Amino acid sequence: MRVASMAATDPVITGFRQAMQELYGPRIERVVLYGSRARGDAKPDSDYDIAVFLRDLSSRWQEVRRIADVELAIFDKTGAMVHAMPYPAESWRNTSSPLMHEIRKDGVDL
């Protein structure tokens, strides 16, 4: 897992990370950028794929709605598409799905 140097310079990433910190604070275990932007092969109009790993995730769909509000605010401000999904913190270590494998392999901690 790499640490994103782009996190300090990309306003979409910094805005999203700040919003997650405000929403979730100590419940955040990690926030991970994955997909084309993490691999470095994104096009200018590529979306931002982000996994948000949360402690005490009781209602995934409630958190999806909260994160969607942040995604919309970022789109309104920057025109960038963010696709973020919440996951239970333990799924980082314990899930063997192809998507989780990709996130662990190519992901960039934000």
Question: Where does each model-flagged region fall?
Answer:
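Short beta-strand->loop micro-motif that forms the acidic, two-metal-ion catalytic signature
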Residues: 49-53
